[in-house]
């Protein structure tokens, strides 16, 4: 609960009003049976004046209790909603501050559940807490004292009833806590399966995998249903057990009073009051049990939220100027292993790229091409060795300076829902239409953007479904070049373009970004044949380095790739 205290302080006035109003509600609730007892005694004595007077007081107390309950509900809801909103915003901001490796460690679907389902659990317990956390102990203690004062001989009935109810509640809470933890994990599993299916819906449709995907989702959903059902079974047992115990206690009390009514006539008026206090004690204990049950679930959710909030980013940045640095790149004996992997992905990699030149990178799948690019952009830090940009270790560069220096365009283009202009302004917030048109001309996206009715204000739908693969890649390149970066990384970013469009993009990059260092990762050698330097990666090591013509002479791997691709192209033209 420590994590919530700073949030409660932001709403201290609402907290105080919620707590004071519940005190008013409890006072009204406790005093009503007492007045009812007085009215019953007045009826027995046929004192109509007292019946009228005490009846008005009873009515006034009831109205006061209703007002207290309404005020408490309103302000408890304000606190719960405010705390949940602020906590969600801070959790989201924390996720944004984490390094790429940290986000991958939790997994995106896991973080989504924490920002939605877990926050909702916290909101519910805060709401219930400010409605019940003050009410339950005050009502319990007050009703217990008044019940004993009303019929002191029946104190043992109360003790037995409480012992039975608390025993059942503790057993249930202990069993249900582990089910609540499993529920959160199962919700994550369901979300992961659904997300993977929807993200890969084209593959599912192409290979007619709908039945298998339905089975996979059903299995995950059935696990969630089974655990939820177990929780439901315990809830189904709790309520009847509680009320059975209370009814037995009431029956015993009535029986005992009936045995002594001839010698103690005053008990006839007291029995109604005593039963009311018994029910109030029962209400307090039941609500306390349910609050404990929901609190155990909320504690699990809070722990999951706290795990993220207390995670220190594995990558930190120095403070400093946001100005970009020069575009030369140097790797000095760099070795890197992904978290959890046994073997390094890059091994003792050393090379230098001059500012304004073009570096091509080729190699088999899994050879470390994308990993190398990620180290330039500092999505990860190397295990050993240094990666330098502009003669400065990237770990010594301020984050804004690094981001203004390096633009990274991925093969799988990610565009955010909104507008085309909104996506471009993510990189250059002050981008004017002239800047957008300049960048679009380079990426060859102007031709289709300007055919759209709203041009650069055209909408980008969720997952950019209203654009083709080639259009998405060209828009991603447009976003990458709009700020005129010192280093532009194209990680197979033209794979969805036809040969003509790819050639036009390359020519425009050469013409418009002459001072920009371009790093091109490509499967096709034709995409990097003009590079000033080409790296051939093989199992994480540089097996060849030089120009296209030099590598044809010196690198067997490069030569084999080139000849294979050339033969394939010649076969297509026959």
Language-model segments: what does each one mean?
Residues 324-574:
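ABC-type nucleotide-binding domain
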Residues 28, 32, 48-50, 56, ...:
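Hydrophobic alpha-helical transmembrane segments of ABC transporter permease domains
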Residues 1-10, 111:
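A short amphipathic helical element positioned immediately N-terminal to and/or at the very start
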Residues 24-28, 32, 59, 63-80, ...:
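Hydrophobic alpha-helical membrane-associated segments
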Residues 12, 97-101, 117-126, 130, ...:
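An intracellular "coupling" helix at the cytosolic face of ABC transporter transmembrane type-1 domains
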